[in-house]
Amino acid sequence: MRIVTTPMCEEVVKISGINNYIVNKNPDEEEGDFAILLSESKVDMDSIQIKLNTPCQLFESIREVSKLNNQLDEDEIIEFFTEYPLCLKYLKNHDNSHVKVKVYSNFLRDIILNMGFEICDENYDYIVFPDYLIDKLDKTDAQLVEIPSHNSVAKNPFERIEMRYSILEKLI
């Protein structure tokens, strides 16, 4: 089976023990049998679509992709998280409902819910938004919290989570 993955998913493919694969931002450009890509992406070939926004999603994605090879057990997957303290900490959802935020974008919504912040449309203290929306936000009294989007962060999902969560942890 010829596997094609995107650069953002390559680390999960490696961790899962798959060695024979092709990396292309546009998997349909390759003559592949199967693609591993982010959930918001679409391809014509058979695929697994994974989410990598939160530690929980990353864990489940590693578990799913590893089924294509020799399935990793929970302890083997957790071992990859030990070098990343925020990834390890947020493998379980938290309750930080005292932090009230308005959030823009689905990928940030996943993160905010995982961290246990309360999502509000009114009476919020912070507006959390992806960097590509900076010029589209209205003036507000709330504190703006800019989070790097996919184009502005590491391809490694652990490093990406650490960076984003470290910004948001300052709100607690």
Range-by-range predicted roles:
Residues 7-55, 85-172:
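Binding-cleft/active-site segments that stabilize strongly anionic ligands or cofactors
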Residues 36-43, 50-78:
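A basic- and aromatic-enriched beta-loop-alpha substructure that forms the phosphate/nucleotide-
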Residues 77-85:
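A nucleotide-sugar donor-handling region in carbohydrate enzymes
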Residues 1-3:
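Extreme N-terminal starter segment of soluble prokaryotic enzymes
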